[in-house]
From Swiss-Prot:
Domain of life: Bacteria
Family classification: Belongs to the universal ribosomal protein uS15 family.
GO CC entries: cytosolic small ribosomal subunit
Pfam families hit by this protein: Ribosomal_S15
Record keywords, A-Z: Ribonucleoprotein, Ribosomal protein, RNA-binding, rRNA-binding
Native source species: Amoebophilus asiaticus (strain 5a2)
A GO molecular-function annotation: rRNA binding
Protein name: Small ribosomal subunit protein uS15
Amino acid sequence: MALNKEDKKDIFLTYSAKNVAQDTGSPESQIALFSNRITYLTEHLKQYPKDKASRLGLIKLVGKRKKQLTYLQNTAIERYRDIIVKLGIRK
């Protein structure tokens, strides 16, 4: 599951506010990384529905992403709307 450096750089370039690969701390980058991991875990749980540890990890990731989205919504509403559209997240 672990993303290699190139995949992470692609995610950061695509979704970061500054469009640089080193922008790992921006909320957009964090949300995109969480979304990637959530997608992977969702597919994993479809194949292995009894994997309770992965289910717990998925629930925690969704909570972390939700907190980041709330922060972004309260601080920069336009950036929030852009990332929601780019990632296709329903809110």
